[in-house]
A protein has these predicted regions:
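Glycine-rich, charge-decorated loop segments at or immediately adjacent to ligand/cofactor-binding or catalytic sites
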Residues: 61-66, 136-158
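Single conserved hydrophobic/aromatic residue that forms the stacking wall/gate
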Residues: 1-13
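Conserved functional hotspot residues or short segments at active or partner-binding sites
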Residues: 248, 252-350, 368
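Glycine/threonine-rich flexible loop motifs
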Residues: 109-121
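Glycine-rich, aromatic-lined ligand/substrate-binding cores of catalytic
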Residues: 201-278
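Short internal beta-strands
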Residues: 50-58, 138
Length: 368
């Protein structure tokens, strides 16, 4: 077993690239270097940090999914927190962009197309390209970096939960993805930004990396992070995936599902104030006892969604249009309605996976 992966930062504050620059950071509560936050380390070393951009869930990481997080100041340091969304088309405003020279990105991602941190990074890269600002990504391991799975996004479904033509599980770090965005000219108007990536050390795509800090309120443990690519689709259905319980993304159920011995009741909790099926007894399945190895072996497993779909017998009332935004293509819902199995559906996107693996290869910083 090799040494555990570490950040290749060396002493980030000794980097020439940050000298005498006005610095903005894109980070949140996961931006820890050892037991200190990047923001505090930069300030302690007398760097001129002028702004913080914070993603969904806010800078301290405690807001609900999609909740409006207003611009403010960080109470601890007094550094202004700027909105990612105060300008046109979900980008920061020109006034925000003129405040700094270089953007430092340090945030823990989980490597899935519908997990929004990478889309925020892409919007910032686009704004930095437009206003000629440098970007420095302090790379972090991807806990789902050991495989690629799912259909490539059909760009007619581009949205906040799907920003790039990549599979659901892209298997890349944010640094690799940033390089690919530049190299494939994926930013609007084919812009590219001035990008530097500081890679991790002792890391390959087969390194199993356990996150020291939960990346958002409803991904509290590794089991939730491994099951997320299979259970997230319940967000587009009436079925609860365990928000408001101790096992978010690790269970699924509904008051009208029958024939199950397991049940749970969603409650209002921090990070899930008003979860689906709030206060109702839901019958269904607990996946949290499945071994990590079993989850990895299955990759994206649509059998959970298919099981609930068949059990509830709601036909067209089961899926909302959000389903296509999450899965990224129109054939999956059709095949589920036609009675196809999870395996048959997965076979349909196998070519996408192989194609993407070839396409991403030039941008990989770590051995596959």
């Amino acid at each position: 077993r090799d040494r555990s992966p570490s950040r290749g930062l060396g002493d980030v504050y000794k980097r020439q690239i940050l000298k005498n620059k006005r610095i903005a950071i894109f980070s949140n509560h996961t931006g820890m270097i050892g037991d200190k936050h990047l923001l505090d380390i930069l300030l302690e070393n007398k760097f001129n940090v002028v702004a913080i951009f914070s993603p969904e869930h806010g800078f301290r990481g405690d807001a609900d999914a999609g909740e409006h997080v207003s611009s403010s100041v960080d109470k601890k340091t007094g550094v202004p927190i700027l909105s990612l969304y105060d300008g046109k088309s979900g980008k920061p405003s020109e006034a925000s962009m003129r405040k700094f020279d270089i953007l430092v990105v340090d945030i823990q991602d989980v490597g899935l197309r519908f997990y929004t941190y990478y889309a925020s990074m892409c919007r910032l890269m686009d704004a930095c390209a437009e206003y000629n600002r440098k970007v420095l990504i302090l790379d972090r391991p991807n806990p789902n970096g050991h495989y690629v799975d799912g259909p490539i996004l059909d760009m007619k479904y581009k949205s906040g939960v799907g920003w790039l033509p990549i599979p659901v599980v892209h298997g890349m770090t944010l640094g690799e993805l940033g390089l690919m965005v530049n190299g494939e000219r994926w930013l609007p108007a084919s812009r590219t930004c001035d990008l530097t990536v500081i890679p991790c050390k002792n890391y390959t795509h087969q390194t199993l990396y356990k996150l020291p800090i939960p990346p958002s309120p409803n991904l509290p443990n590794m089991k939730s992070i491994y099951l997320y690519p299979s259970t997230c689709y319940f967000e587009a259905t009436p079925v609860s995936l365990g928000r408001g319980t101790d096992l978010p993304f690790q269970v699924y159920g509904h008051p009208n599902m029958t024939g199950y011995s397991y049940s749970f009741t969603p409650r209002s909790v921090p990070g899930a104030k008003n979860p689906p099926q709030l206060g109702k007894l839901c019958h269904g399945v607990n996946l949290s006892n499945m071994s990590d190895e079993e989850i990895w072996k299955r990759g994206i497993d649509l059998s959970y969604v298919i099981d609930a779909y068949r059990n509830l017998n709601m036909d067209d009332h089961f899926f909302r249009s959000f389903f296509e935004l999450l899965i990224g293509t129109d054939y999956v819902r059709k095949m589920i309605k036609e009675g196809k199995s999870a395996e048959e559906i997965k076979a349909r996107w196998k070519d996408d996976v192989e194609k993407f693996k070839v396409q991403r290869k030039p941008y990989l910083l770590y051995e596959e």
